[in-house]
Each structure stands twice: as structure tokens, then as C-alpha cells.
UniProtKB/Swiss-Prot annotation:
Its cofactor is Mn(2+); Mg(2+). PANTHER family: RIBONUCLEASE H2 SUBUNIT A, RIBONUCLEASE HII. Endonuclease that specifically degrades the RNA of RNA-DNA hybrids. This is Ribonuclease HII. The gene is rnhB. Coiled coil: none annotated. Manganese or magnesium. Binds 1 divalent metal ion per monomer in the absence of substrate. May bind a second metal ion after substrate binding. GO terms for biological process: DNA replication, removal of RNA primer; mismatch repair.
Length: 216
């Protein structure tokens, strides 16, 4: 597995600088990868992989956490229309409890790459952990603010997960999933205390495991 020392200097790159430097190394099909939902008490962790055409412009695309829900949805549609390929993967609460959140996140990222209709020859990954694939790759801390491909993936992952959690609102009423998307806010914690965990709660997470009955 190859790694590149792309930025020996401290100069802050533009959102396409990582992609441009990787292309100059001879790679043509670069996938940005990010996840949404590592921290919540309920629901899956969702990962997205996005391959953008060379030179594409996506005004407004940045780290999904910095965008309003309305803007994220608008940019989701723009990315889906502009990208060369988009793949989405997920790991449910059961898998998270079984193998831990880090390994479940990497599994979701691996699945997202496998769902791409174009095989990538290089991966740019948000964070510090590499995906278990024999594809050249680089991890980038805060990559969703530094790479356009990763920023696009962060929006796809976030919107995809939010929509899934809104669907869970009707399947598991009483927890308020549409509002908090599974995060551990006061109202969600109160609902867990009153109703107990449901099927999509992460039963090894603090805030949930205290309410898991022994027979479960």
C-alpha cells in the first residue's frame, strides 16, 4: 500500500489541492470517503465514497457539520448530479456492538467503496484510520474541511443517515429520532429511561447499556 507525503510545508491547501497532487502522481480515479454517526446512541454509522470529475466545481460544499439541514439537502442533490460515482455503506447497531464503533466504521467505508460503479485507484479518507483495502490511500485529519471529495462524501453520508433516522421515527415512536438523529440529548436520554432501548440502540454505549435488561 503506497502512501504519499503530499504536504511537506505548512501552507493550507485549497479544497482541490489534495486531489490535484494525487493526480500529478498518476492517479486518475480518486474517491473521497467520510462517515456520519459514530457518536450517536442509536442507529447505524453510515459512510460514503464519492468520485468527482477532474476540475468539477461544487460551490458551497464543505464539512457537512458546518451546513444547515436545508443547505445539506440542496448540496446532496448537486453532488449526486455532478459526481462520477457515489457509494454508500452502513453498519447497524448490532454490528457496532459486536465489533466496536471503529471497526464498524471501517466496515461501512469498505462497503461504500464496493458500491462505487467505478473502481477507484486512490482513496482520500477523513480521519486517521485507513480502510482495509489494498488501494493506495491517505488519511487526512479534518479532511472534510480540506478536500472537496471528502467534503462531498461527508454530505452524502450525513444526509443519507439523517433520512434513515427520520424513517425510524415511525418504526420506533417515542424516542424522537427525527429530531435528534439518535444523539444523546436530554430528550433522548429521558426516552431511553422511560421506554428502555429499542432495536436500533447501541447497547454497549454508555447511556444505553445501563438500561439493557439481562435477558437481552
Amino acid at each position: 500500500m503506497k502512501t504519499l507525503n503530499l504536504f511537506p510545508c505548512e501552507e493550507r491547501p485549497s479544497l482541490l489541492e489534495f486531489e490535484s497532487l494525487v493526480r500529478r502522481q498518476g492517479y486518475a480515479c480518486i474517491a473521497g470517503i467520510d462517515e456520519a454517526g459514530r457518536g450517536p446512541l442509536a442507529g447505524p454509522v453510515v459512510a460514503a465514497a464519492v468520485i468527482l470529475p477532474n476540475g468539477v466545481e461544487l460551490p458551497g460544499v464543505n464539512d457537512s457539520k458546518k451546513l444547515s439541514p436545508v443547505k445539506r439537502n440542496e448540496l446532496f442533490d448537486l453532488i449526486m448530479a455532478s459526481a462520477s460515482a457515489v457509494g454508500v455503506g452502513s453498519s447497524d447497531a448490532g454490528l457496532i456492538d459486536e465489533i466496536n464503533i471503529l471497526q464498524a466504521t471501517l466496515a461501512a467505508m469498505k462497503q461504500a467503496v464496493s458500491m462505487l460503479c467505478i473502481p477507484p485507484d486512490y482513496l482520500l479518507i477523513d480521519g486517521i484510520s485507513k480502510v482495509p483495502l489494498s488501494i493506495p490511500q491517505k488519511t487526512i485529519k479534518k479532511g472534510d474541511s480540506l478536500s472537496l471529495s471528502i467534503a462531498a462524501a461527508s454530505i452524502i453520508a450525513k444526509v443519507s443517515r439523517d433520512r434513515l433516522m427520520m424513517d425510524y421515527e415511525t418504526r420506533f415512536p417515542g424516542y424522537g429520532f427525527a429530531a435528534h438523529k439518535g444523539y444523546g440529548c436530554v430528550s433522548h436520554m429521558a426516552a431511553i429511561a422511560e421506554l428502555g432501548p429499542c432495536a436500533i440502540h447501541r447497547k454497549t454505549f454508555r447511556g444505553v447499556k445501563e438500561y439493557v435488561r439481562s435477558e437481552e
